[in-house]
Structure formats: C-alpha cells, structure tokens
Amino acid sequence: MLKSLRYGKEFEELYTGNYSRLYYYAYQFLNDAEVSRDVVNDAFEYVWKNYENFRKMNVVAILFLSVRNKSIDTFRHNKVEE
C-alpha cells in the first residue's frame, strides 16, 4: 500500500507539473480544446497504467511522445471524416 501511495503522489506531481504544457502541445495540432484535453488525459492514463515500467525512464518525454502520436492520429482521423 505504501508503494501505491508513493506512486500516486509521484503521479500527481507529474500531472500537475505537466498538464498545461501537454495540453497546449496537443492544441497546436488539433485546434480543439475538448479533443486536446481528451488526448492529454489518454496519455496520462496510459502512463498511469504502465507507471511501474516507466518510473526509471523520462516519463515526461513519454507523455509528450504519446500526446504527439495521439494528436496526429486524431488529426488524420478527423481529416478523413471531412
């Protein structure tokens, strides 16, 4: 339980310290506030589910890469629908 509490605190700091930057990064690709929030939240969910594996890596870089890839995928998907 202490381990999960520690991870929760680390993740909370990661979230509060990086959410805004990731949101604006996604928004540059998507120009849609709601979709940008969804993309960023998906990236954080991915990291949370795999946090044990990522702890020794540059998690912020993983988040930016995840947001970038998801933003590009979403942009392409939206273009096809138009």
What do these predicted ranges mean?
Residues 10, 21, 25, 35, ...:
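Amphipathic alpha-helical recognition patches that constitute DNA-binding helices
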Residues 1-24, 28:
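A short, charge-rich alpha-helical start-of-domain segment used by transcription regulators
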Residues 65-82:
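Arg/Lys-rich amphipathic alpha helix in sigma70-family domain 2
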Residues 15, 23, 33-49:
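Conserved RNAP core-binding helix
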Residues 27-31, 52-55:
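Amphipathic alpha-helical interaction elements
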Residues 4, 41-58, 77-78:
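Sigma70-family region 2
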